[in-house]
Structure formats: structure tokens, C-alpha cells
Amino acid sequence: MSMVRLYTRVLELLGAEARLGWILAGANLLLAGAQFAEPVLFGRIIDVLSGNPASGLFGMASTSPWPLLAVWAAFGLFTILCGVTVALQADRLSHRQRQAVLTGYFEHIMQLPLAYHAGTHSGRLMKVMLQGTDALWRLWLGFFREHFAAMMSLVVLLPLSLYINWRLAILLFALCIVFTMLTTLVVRRTFDMQNEVEAHFSDLSARASDALGNVALVQSFVRVDAEVQGLRFVVDKLLSAQMPVLSWWAVVTVMTRASTTITILAIFTAGIALNQRGMTSIGEIVMFVSFATMLIQRLEQVVSFINSVFMEAPRLKEFFDVLDAVPAVRDRPDAVDPGRLQGRVEFNDVSFSYDSKRPAVANLSFVASPGETIALVGPTGAGKSTAVALLHRAFDPQSGIIRIDGMDIRDLTLSGLRRNIGVVFQEPLLFNRSIAENLRVGKPDATDEEMRLAAGRAQALDFIERGEKKFDTHAGERGRMLSGGERQRLSIARALLKDPPILILDEATSALDAVTEAKVNAALDEVMKGRTTFVIAHRLSTIRNAARILVFADGRVIESGTFGELLANGGHFAQLAKAQFMTQESTQADLSSSRTNPAVEIRPLSLGN
């Protein structure tokens, strides 16, 4: 993305504030004209005081300094009032729009597919959001407060200086050419360097976020020093990349100061020579010295603007790259909100592939009646999770149709569809907020009594009531202040509050101990009542009561039936069940033997001699 296109997009993000932006641009143009008038009036007053009549001021002649001083005061008052107004409105515009863009960015990334989030570190997305919106704010604020006025000053000053005295104006044009050449050189030399700097910033943010998100692991494996050393290594690479960029821009600063002195000396030298020939006045020499000082200040502001755009460019590019990421699924223009559905689910010859090479599911067809429990079993990667992900449109199938109550789910709004589907994940997902706030994710307007009832049905009320703050107890980051079973029961209570007609249980008890699993299963039995339920399970003992079991392998359903029917068929499911139950029976026998046989002793594993 070119620098011009990049900055055009920055201005496009002004959105509804664009009208105010145009007003500020017009005010800056007036400011530029008013600021130009001051050195002109100053020079003419010098001429009057030195005995020369002030001719040529917009076609007006004067032999007295007082009218000129009055005009100068009027221009000065206008400049002050207009400048204050521009500054205030520019501040408010940039702050308002920063918050609007930040909110829009957040909404956008929350709608991106899970596959995008799986491949993108959350720390990077946070860094891009905060640094990108801060960069936009700085550019908007600088542009409307200073930089646009500086550019307009150049547009006004250079042509009018030619009109007043073209010989002295040539020196001002030469100064502009030198500045332009120097700035272009530095920008070209440092563009790739600055991109490398921002890449190291992203690495730094991702590494720090990764370590902070795994503090328990770091401390458990005594990795604090190693992680700090790793962070220092990234910081060192960042500084090594940053130093050459800073050196080049330091050269610009030095050359700017040198240009100030050289230009003023050149104007005085040329002015004296022209004055001796009667080709300019003392007032014009003073005027052009003021022009030179003003020009250098404005050029410095323009260079600062170019520098800021250049320095922010990698951050803005990252920001726009995320904004340009397209959600995998979107609402169709004519999508409808279905209201509450009955829960009849039909997969009709559905196929989907993540990489267009190996199918994740292939020619999948089945029907689930309202209130029916369907279990999905099979090895990891067989297509179980993909099938239910297609149901709530995490992705859309490449072929085939999924219908609920006879309607193609792609004809439904995403919010309307997902409002009818509840998910209880294997790893309970909780916010770093109170228990009440986490429960209200399922039903934002839930009353306290509704939350108590849902918690009771989910076997969660006992541990909530034991807490000092009860429903106001903080769950901690990702729910870490609670045990695994407590987190899972809260997620079940949340699903009960949502009260969806369709429920997905994604291995909801696979990581729990036997006692906790019994409590959670009791809660699951409650939440499954009257709902079309899809259960993904590796523990086959948990799906004995399923109305139907679909056995997946390589993205296809290879067997279907009840628990008893599949065992009797002696197929893939029967072999899997036999292996699991034999393992469990062997484990139980070993435990029983260890309790009754005193000769059996458990000893630590010894490595070596």
C-alpha cells in the first residue's frame, strides 16, 4: 500500500466527521493567509519608519505606520481566535473518531472466524488495535491543528513572495527544493528499516503476552530467567533496527538548523546587494527574513508530518490488514431472523475442506428430530467438531445444505441462528468478571432469581453460595479462580439461561475427575431436556442414552445406530467400546489388587541404576 493510499484511508476513516474536517481545512487556509500578512505588514512598517512610503501592500499606499499597525492587530486577533477554535475542534474530532474507530475495529475482529483467531496471537490483535488507533489519533490531531495549516502556508507564501520580489523569492524556492530532496532521500533510506522495527515490536508484544498468559507454566518449569532473556533478545534486535532510523532523522534535524542560518545569511547578502542598486527596500529585506523564518518553521512542520506518516505507516498497514480481513461467513442481504426454532436439524450431502485438499467432512447426511440427542464419536480429526462448527456457521460448507426446521441456515441472520444454539465447550470459557456477569452472557436481562434457578439446575448454586460475595464473586482470568468442575457447571448454567432449542456439548466432561464428572453429568441431563442435542464424546460410557450415535472416520459417517445396536453389529464402534471398557476394567482390577494384596507396592520410578 503506497503512502498516498495509506493516508487517504486515514482520512476516509473520518466518516461522519468528514464535514467538520472540511470546515477545519477551510479555517486552516484562512489562518495561512492571515499569518502571511504579518511579515508583510512588519516589512511595510519598517519602510515607513525608514522614510519610504509603504506602497504595494495589496495596492494600498501609506505614509503613517498607525493604519498598518491597526490592520496588523486585526490580523493578529483573527489568527488567535481562529487558531484556538481550530485547536479545540481538532482535539475533539480526533478523540471522538479514535473511540469510534476503536469500537469498530473491536466489533470487526470479534466477527472474524475462529480459524483466523487460532492463527493470530491475541496479544498482536490488541497491540494492532491500540497502536493503530493511537496512530490515527496523532495523525488526525496533527493534520488539523498544524500540518494542514503549514502546507497551506507554503501554498500562499511562495507565490506571493514571487509577486513582492522575485529575486529574493528564488532563495525561498531553493530552500524548499533542498528540504524536499533531503526528506525524500531519508524516507527512501529508512522505509524498509521502519517496517523491520514494527515487525520487532509485534514480536515483542506477542512474546510478552505469551509469557504472561502462561505464568504458571513459566514458574513451574523455572523458566523466568529464560523468558526474560528471550524478551531481552527481542528488545536488542528492536533497538538495533531502530538506531539507524533515528540517525537518519537526526541528519534531517541538523540540516534544518543549518539551512536556517544559511538562508537568512543569503537573504541579507542578496538583499544588501539589491538595496544598493535600488531594487529592494530595507522593509522588504526584513520581510523576506521573516518569510524565511516562517518558511523554515512550516517546512519543519511538513517534514514532521511526513516523518509521522512514515513512522506510523507500518502500524497503520497492520491495522488496515486486520480491518481488511473478511469474515468467513456473512449475513446474506435477504437473511431473516427466524425467532425461536423448533430444533429439527438436517444435514444434506454436506462437504467441507479447510485446505481444499483433504475433506474435513464429506457427503454428510443425517436428520435430528426436535428434542433428539445425537452423539458424535470417532478419532481426533474425524470431522466431529467440524460438523457442529458448520451447524452454527463458524464456516459454510463448500457443497450441500444444512437446514433447521426446513430453512437453509444461510438464509438466517447469524445472530438469529446462533441465538437458537447453545454450546458447552470442553474448556469452559469465562470472562474475567463476576459470576453474575458470566451467567448473563447467556441472557443479558436475566433476573437474580433466574440466575439462582439456572445455577441450581446446573449443580452450581452450592459453591456459589459458599463464596463470600456469592454471585458477585470474581471468576478470575479465564475463570482460574474456580475449579474445572465449577467452571463447567457455570457454563452449563449459562446455557440454561440462554434456553436454546439446540445444544452442542463439546466433550464437556472429558477433563474432569469421576466425582466432578458425576455432578456435571447430572447438570447436563437437566440442560438436555427437551432440546436437540449434539454430544461430541470420547468417553463412550457418557453416551449410552443417546437416541442415535454417528461414528465418524475420515470426515464420513461410517456407522449409525443406538448404543446397543452398534455394539451388536460388531463394527468399528464395538471395537472402540471394547478397547475402552477393557482398559477401564483392567484399571479397576489393578486398583482392587493393590488394595487387597500387601505385596503390591507403588514405588517412585527410578531412572538410571
UniProtKB/Swiss-Prot annotation:
ABC transporter domain sequence ranges: 345-579
Disulfide cysteine pairs (residue numbers): none
Alphabetized GO MF terms: ABC-type beta-glucan transporter activity; ABC-type oligopeptide transporter activity; ATP binding; ATP hydrolysis activity
InterPro entries on file: AAA+_ATPase, ABC1_TM_dom, ABC1_TM_sf, ABC_transporter-like_ATP-bd, ABC_transporter-like_CS, NdvA, P-loop_NTPase, Type_1_exporter
GO cellular component term of the entry, any: plasma membrane
Record Pfam families: ABC_membrane (PF00664), ABC_tran (PF00005)
Keyword set, alphabetical order: ATP-binding, Cell inner membrane, Cell membrane, Membrane, Nucleotide-binding, Sugar transport, Translocase, Transmembrane, Transmembrane helix, Transport
The keyword Cell membrane belongs to this UniProt entry's keyword annotation: yes
E.C. designation(s): 7.5.2.3
Domain called ABC transmembrane type-1: residue spans: 21-311
Main location, first listed in the record: membrane
Spans traversing the lipid bilayer: 22-42, 68-88, 146-166, 167-187, 248-268, 285-305
List of residues binding ATP: 378-385
Top-level enzyme category: translocase
Record remark: domains: In NdvA the ATP-binding domain (NBD) and the transmembrane domain (TMD) are fused.
Job description of the protein: Involved in beta-(1-->2)glucan export. Transmembrane domains (TMD) form a pore in the inner membrane and the ATP-binding domain (NBD) is responsible for energy generation.
NCBIfam families the UniProt entry points to: chvA (TIGR01192), PRK13657.1 (NF010178)
Protein name (record): Beta-(1-->2)glucan export ATP-binding/permease protein NdvA
Gene assigned in the entry: ndvA
